Amino acid sequence: TNNLNQYLLDKIDPKLNDYESIICNPINVSGAKKIKMIKRGWRNLIKDPLILFNKQKETVAFHFDMHHGHNNLNKAASLLEKKDKNDFIYYINNHNFYNPHIMCIARPEILEKWFNSLFSWLKKCEEVFGFDNLKGYDTLRLYAYLAERYLSYWFKKYTKYKEQPWVSLNL
């Protein structure tokens, strides 16, 4: 189509005024193929073999371990401020969905709090993980993957949120 603007969100539907933030619809991380879980999640399976038979145990943390480096998410979570650390660790170890794409719509004062929390945490993560050893799909974009998981937790804890599709086109 010639006019991209007709597909862009340029104003918020008044029905959404009761919400403080809009985040993308969640995606479910459970349901990985057994062979992939064995190949990429073997360390987790040694600790808890029931993961193979219980989709509820295929948590955000398990998925992250399989795709972005074993224990990286838990290591990063331990660097959070005290007020968020335990709740975030609970979230990643007990949920099997997250809101992807690091996309949100919120008022400036909420975004300022979000970015302050996020970037102070990521700065601590940089001191632990650095950049030199982050290579390949698994870890090259580690900080983006961490931010993506944290967004789901943070906006649900600190705002009255609404989940929406990140795209809706009627072509």
Which residue stretches match the model-derived regions?
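ER/Golgi luminal nucleotide-sugar-dependent glycosyltransferases, focusing on the catalytic module
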Residues: T1-L171
